[in-house]
Regions:
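Extracellular/periplasmic carbohydrate-active domains that bind, remodel
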Residues: 1-184
């Protein structure tokens, strides 16, 4: 187990600036800012992160908890806890993220999926905070068993608030397409 503490008085700090390709993982890690300042807890905006795994990662404080950028190659996140970020818990720009068991606490925005190429799959997660929406989506999302509290809406998609603020059993951007008839 590893704890990375950026201390106090470091407004430009990044807890972990990380990139992995083909085989890499961050596991059992806590990243925290002593005074809540700093740019990001885990920053993966350098070209080109993934495939990689983040598992059992906690981030406390910072402007953003986890930042992901670039259109390649996809990341898997599981058992993620993001607390008290000033702007956003998880920011994704044009990458593909598969997330299971993510919890946010005290964030104004849980997930910002920006860029038309961004894809977020979010399963079995609890988004707690306070703000207009828990998830802001400008790309594509698939949500299953996602609950939220404290937000006005669970999802703002392409500028339109989607109904439902507490629990969403299943939702996806667009429509389901299948080549053959299938029993539902």
């Amino acid at each position: 187990d590893l704890v990375v503490d950026t201390g106090t008085g470091n407004p430009g700090a990044v807890g972990i600036d990380w990139i992995a390709n083909n085989l890499g993982a961050l596991r059992r890690i806590t990243v925290r800012s002593g005074d809540g300042q700093g740019v990001a807890g885990v920053d993966m905006t350098r070209a080109w992160p993934g495939p990689a795994l983040l598992r059992d990662v906690q981030v406390e404080g910072f402007e953003a908890g986890i930042r992901v950028g670039n259109a390649e190659y996809g990341l898997t996140l599981e058992d993620i806890t993001l607390r008290n970020q000033r702007t956003v818990g998880l920011s994704n720009t044009d990458n593909v993220l598969a997330i299971r068991h993510m919890t946010t606490e005290g964030v104004p925005l849980a997930i910002d999926n920006s860029g038309s190429g961004g894809h977020v799959i979010l399963l079995d997660s609890q988004l707690n905070g306070s703000g207009a929406e828990a998830i802001r989506n400008e790309g594509h999302v698939f949500l299953r068993r996602v609950a939220s509290s404290g937000f006005d809406a669970l999802l703002l998609e392409h500028g339109t608030a989607r109904p439902g603020t507490a629990v969403l059993d299943e939702y996806l951007t667009g429509t389901v397409q299948q080549p053959f008839d299938s029993p539902q």
